[in-house]
Amino acid sequence: MVKSKIYIDKIYWERVQLFVEGHSENLDLEDSNFVLRNLTETRTMKANDVKIDGNQFVCRFNVAILDNGYYLPEDKYLLVNEQELDYIAQLNPDVINDAYQNLKPEQEEEYNELETQNGKINFLLQTYLKEFRKGGISKKTVYTVTPEISSDVNEFVLDVVVTTPEVKSIYIVRKYKELRKYFRKQSFNTRQFIFKAIFNTTKFFHLKKGNTVLFTSDSRPTMSGNFEYIYNEMLRQNLDKKYDIHTVFKANITDRRGIIDKFRLPYLLGKADYIFVDDFHPLIYTVRFRRSQEVIQVWHAVGAFKTVGFSRTGKKGGPFIDSLNHRSYTKAYVSSETDIPFYAEAFGIKEKNVVPTGVPRTDVLFDEAYATQIKQEMEDELPIIKGKKVILFAPTFRGSGHGTAHYPFFKIDFERLARYCEKNNAVVLFKMHPFVKNRLNIADKHKQYFVDVSDFREVNDILFITDLLISDYSSLIYEYAVFKKPMIFYAFDLEDYITTRDFYEPYESFVPGKIVQSFDALMDALDNEDYEGEKVIPFLDKHFKYQDGRSSERLVRNLFGS
C-alpha cells in the first residue's frame, strides 16, 4: 500500500510570523487546510496563509493573532493537514541532520550525554526555539515557542509556554487572600485535631480485640472491586454473624466527606479490628493504630506493572523516604510470590506481611457459569459483536494527570482499521481510560466496525467476549491473560514512557505479546496474526499463583482463620 505523508523541511521566523516549509508524499495538497491542533483536540488554529506549489507547501502562522485576533495560547500543537482524512506533519530527518552538523564541540559533548533518542532530537531542535521577552529584556514575562518531539505522543509539536510574573494585587485583595489562606489552614488543623481526638478516644476504649470490620476507600463510592468479593465471601462463611461490618466510602479523593462520615470514619478507624483499604487513603496515615488492629491493603490493580508508592521515591509525585504513607498496612494481599518484593517496596512494609492468596476480584474470571451468562448479556447489549472477531482497544491515558489526560486518536488510521475489520469479519471496541477528556468520534461509515464502550460497565465483563486485546501500559493485561488469548502492545511512545513512568520489570521482556511502535507495525501484526501469543501462558503462570477462582476464600480464611 502506498503511504501518504506530510514532512516539515524547514522552520524559520520573521518577527511574530512562524513559517513552516515542507512537502507531501503521495498526497494532493490542493483544497486542503493546514492547522495547528492541540493534543486534546479542543483547539484548532488555521494558518494565516498557505502557498502550495505541487507537493511543496509554505505555511505562515502569526502567533500574535492566531487565536481569533489573540495570541496562540499556551499548549502543545501538532501541524495537521486537513482533508477527508487528517495527516499529521512529521519532521524531515534532514532537519535534524543539519542541526547536528552545526553543533559546537561543547554542544556535541552535551548531546552525547543524553539518554533517549527524543531527548537528543529535542536538544537539536533548540536551534529553532523562539522567545519573545517583554521589552526585549524581561526575564519574567516571556512567550516561548519550542519545536520538539512530544513525550506524550512521540510526534513533532510546537510547545507554547507563556511565563508572566505574579500579578501584584491591591492591598485589600492581598490581605483577603492572606486571611483566607490562614483560616483554611486553621480549619484544616481543627479538622485534623477533631479527627485525631475522636480516633484516639475511641482507640483508648477499645484496647481489647473485638469483632468490628471496616471497609473504607477514598476512591470508591460503593462496595465494589475486591471489597465486594471479600464481603460476599464473608457472608458465604457466615462471618457477618460473628463480626459487625461497616463501610465508609467516597467516590474521589478530592471529594468532601459528608458531615456524618466526618465523625464516623475516625470513630470506626479507632474501633475496628480489621480495616480494609484498596488504594491510597491519606487519613489513615496520620494516626497510630493499636497493635491488635489489622490494616489490610487489597490493592485495586492486579500484579506489579508501573511503579507506585515508595518505588517512586526521588521521582516526581513519589513520597520521600521518611513519609508515613502506606506504612500503616499490617498485611497486603497479592496474586503471586513474584509480587511480594515489589509490593513490600511500594508500601514500605516487610515482605513477610505481603501474602500471595490471589486477588479476589479475579475470581469471576474463572467462573464458567458466569462466563456463559455474561457472554449472552454482552451480545444482547452489543448485537454488533455476534459472530464477529472482537478486538478490544484499551490503552491508558497520556498527559501528566487527571486535568491533562487525553489519548492521541490521530495515532490510529481508522480507515485502514475499518478495512481490516471488513476483510476479517471483525469489530473493534474502544475502552478509553476514565480520565481521557477528548472523546472518540466514530464516523457514520465506520459505525458497523467500531463501538465506543468507554462508558460501559465493568471492563472485566468485556474481556469475556474479547478475542484480541490491544493495549499499551494498562494493568488490564493481567486479567486478560486468564483467558489465554493474544495481545498486542501499541507502545508508540515507549522510550519516553519508560523514562518518565518506570516499570518494575523491563517492559520489552515483561509484556505477554508483540510490541509495536507504529500503526503500520500494528496493522502488519494484525494482518499476519503475529501476536507472539506463546508469551501469554508463562506470564499467567508467573503472575497467578492460583487459577481456581478461590482467591476470596483464601484471603478470608488467612485473615479471619475461618
From Swiss-Prot:
Belongs to the CDP-glycerol glycerophosphotransferase family. GO terms for cellular component: plasma membrane. One of its GO terms (biological process) is cell wall organization. Gene3D superfamilies: 3.40.50.11820, 3.40.50.12580. It catalyses: 4-O-[di(2R)-glycerylphospho]-N-acetyl-beta-D-mannosaminyl-(1->4)-N-acetyl-alpha-D-glucosaminyl di-trans,octa-cis-undecaprenyl diphosphate + n CDP-L-ribitol = 4-O-[(D-ribitylphospho)(n)-di{(2R)-glycerylphospho}]-N-acetyl-beta-D-mannosaminyl-(1->4)-N-acetyl-alpha-D-glucosaminyl di-trans,octa-cis-undecaprenyl diphosphate + n CMP + n H(+). Keywords: Cell membrane, Cell wall biogenesis/degradation, Membrane, Teichoic acid biosynthesis, Transferase. This is Teichoic acid ribitol-phosphate polymerase TarL. The lineage of its organism: Bacteria, Bacillati, Bacillota, Bacilli, Bacillales. One of its GO terms (molecular function) is CDP-glycerol glycerophosphotransferase activity. It is a peripheral membrane protein. The gene is tarL. Pathway: Cell wall biogenesis; poly(ribitol phosphate) teichoic acid biosynthesis. It is found in: Cell membrane. It comes from Staphylococcus aureus (strain NCTC 8325 / PS 47). The keyword Ribonucleoprotein does not apply. Disulfide bonds: none annotated. The keyword Cell cycle does not apply. InterPro entries: Glycerophosphate_synth, TagF_C, TagF_N, TarL, Teichoic_Acid_Biosynth. Its EC number is 2.7.8.14.
